[in-house]
Structures are given as structure tokens and as C-alpha cells.
Amino acid sequence: GKYIMPYFLADFLKLHPDVELILDVTNKSKVIKSLERNEVDFSLVSILPETLTVNRIELMPNRLFLVSNSATEFPEKIYDKNILENIPIILREMGSGTRQSMEQFMLLNNLNVKKKLELTSNEAVKQAVIAGLGCSIMPIIGIKNEITTGNLQIIPVRGLPIQSTWNLIWHKNKNFSPIAKAYLAFLEEYKQDIIKSKFDWTNSI
């Protein structure tokens, strides 16, 4: 989420320079608890909560690819899904939306994956992959620079990328402040322009 939300906030904050904002980057399970306790106005998730009734705005697609460091050779043009059973896999922690997406994919495809390492942020996972500790399935939105510079490579696998959607959600019974209502109106008007200007590159991968 930290790779996305700043771009959906920047122009809004220019229009409302007096607004003070707190942006907390955490995993999905903690995000849902914050909504339940009415501690936040909005949350950004790629998997909708099952235990909480929310409203939402779909922001943009979320695609997760299998990646490794560039020093590891993967010469085939495309691999079968069972490659995931033969390489060390680095996972996010329990409660992470990325972790949940990976586990759903593995369960759906009856894959017995060897967990090499578990880390608590996408940045930590990314650095571990670059260091050669294993491979991981990661959101493309967070690895643009590493793909461009050659520190990471995408391993083409049948059935990947995993497809989901980034949703801005809020509690169904949330009573919004005027500025929160203004932000929703801003998103409805400018969402597509932001996606086109800031994230169009994801369509070329």
C-alpha cells in the first residue's frame, strides 16, 4: 500500500494544505482491527475482510509475480507451477494480504512449498531475495526500480501473476468528517487520471 497511497494523496493535499495526515503502513489483520475500533477513516487492502462490513472504492489492479535475484539462472521461457516446490520461498508474516494471496494460490494448485524465511515487510522480503536467500511472490507495484536496474527478475510461471484489486475501504457505519467526504469525491473525479499518469507502466509487464 505504501507504494500506492502517496500518489492518491499528493494532489489532494495540495488542494487542502492545512490537512494533517497519519499514514500507517501495517499488515491486513492490523488494518482491519483499526477499522473495527474506529481508529482510522480509510484502509487500503488487496483482500477484503470477511468479518467486517465495509464500503469500498476500487483503486487499481494488484498483480503478484514470482521473482528472484538476477544472479540465479532461469533459462526457460515459462515454468510450470510446481517450480514453487523446488525453490526456497520467502514469505510475509501471517496476517499479511500478500501472504494470504500466496497461500491461496498454493492451496488451489496443491503445491507443497518449502518456506525458507518469513519477514514482516515487503521491503525486507525484497532485500532477502536480492541477497539470494530465496524467491518470493511480490506485488509488481513495489519492485519497479529493482526490475529496471536488474537487481530482480520475474520468473515466468503458468498461472501467475496472481490477480487482485487494491481497494480503499471504510466501515459501513463510519461517520465521515467533511474532509474525508472531500477525499472520496476527489478520488471519484481523479482516480483514473492518477492511474494513467503514475501506474500505466504496470501494463507493459
Cite the ranges covered by each PLM segment.
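Central regulatory/effector-binding core of bacterial HTH transcription factors
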Residues: 1-52, 119, 205
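A late-sequence structural motif
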Residues: 3-4, 153-197, 204
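Ligand-binding cleft/hinge of the Venus flytrap
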Residues: 8-16, 99-112
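Hydrophobic hinge/microswitch elements
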Residues: 27-32, 36-40, 45-46, 103-154
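Short secondary-structure boundary segments
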Residues: 47-48, 70, 140-142, 159, ...
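Flexible hinge/capping segments at coil-to-helix
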Residues: 51-94
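Short beta-strand->loop
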Residues: 55-65, 149-162
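Secondary-structure junction motif
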Residues: 74-75, 88-109, 176-180, 184-185, ...
